């Protein structure tokens, strides 16, 4: 089930697909 959540890792992104699992790319430029 862990892969269904957004891991609390600070990752830079330009789009949702840059992020892990259920993370989405926030306006701040980081996954969340």
From Swiss-Prot:
- Please give the chief subcellular localization of this protein: secreted
What residue ranges carry the coiled-coil annotation?
Answer: none
CDD domains for this protein: PlantTI
Q: Which InterPro entries match?
A: Prot_inh_squash, Proteinase_amylase_inhib_sf
GO cellular component annotations of the record: extracellular region
Site entry: Reactive bond: 8-9
Q: Which SMART domains match?
A: PTI
Is Secreted set as a keyword in this record?
yes
GO MF annotations in UniProt: serine-type endopeptidase inhibitor activity
Q: Which Gene3D superfamilies match?
A: 4.10.75.20
Q: Which domain of life is it from?
A: Eukaryota
Q: Which Pfam families match?
A: Squash
The written remark on domains in the entry is: The presence of a 'disulfide through disulfide knot' structurally defines this protein as a knottin.
Q: What is this protein called?
A: Trypsin inhibitor 2b
Its source organism is Sechium edule (Chayote)
Source organism phylogeny: Eukaryota, Viridiplantae, Streptophyta, Embryophyta, Tracheophyta
